[in-house]
Amino acid sequence: MSFLNGLFGRKRDSSAELAKQRLLTVLIDDRYKLTPEMMAQMKADLAEVLKRYLPAIDAEQIEVTLSRGEAHDLLKADVPLRRATDHPPNR
């Protein structure tokens, strides 16, 4: 049976992995004392600054997350940019 699991790959229990990720998120949030309100304000501040340099950012779609890396914790900001066809220049 282990041969078949190795051949086809056995998926990890998704609920256990989800619980692990949630626990890590809680621990990281607790370590840095960042409340949801502070994260929302950080997201708004990032959007404001980035719009000065990149007017095509989609501020509503910005995602800011804290995660645990191998050597250190990470603050990650995903900032979607509208393509030129999606956002015509102002004239």
From Swiss-Prot:
Give the record's keywords alphabetically: Cell cycle, Cell division
Q: Name one GO cellular component term.
A: plasma membrane
Q: Which SUPFAM superfamilies match?
A: Cell division protein MinE topological specificity domain (SSF55229)
GO biological process annotations for this chain's record?
division septum site selection; regulation of division septum assembly
What InterPro entries does this protein's entry cite? MinE, MinE_sf
Superkingdom of origin: Bacteria
Provide the function of this protein: Prevents the cell division inhibition by proteins MinC and MinD at internal division sites while permitting inhibition at polar sites. This ensures cell division at the proper site by restricting the formation of a division septum at the midpoint of the long axis of the cell.
Q: Which family does it belong to?
A: Belongs to the MinE family.
**What protein does this entry describe?**
Cell division topological specificity factor
Q: Which gene encodes it?
A: minE
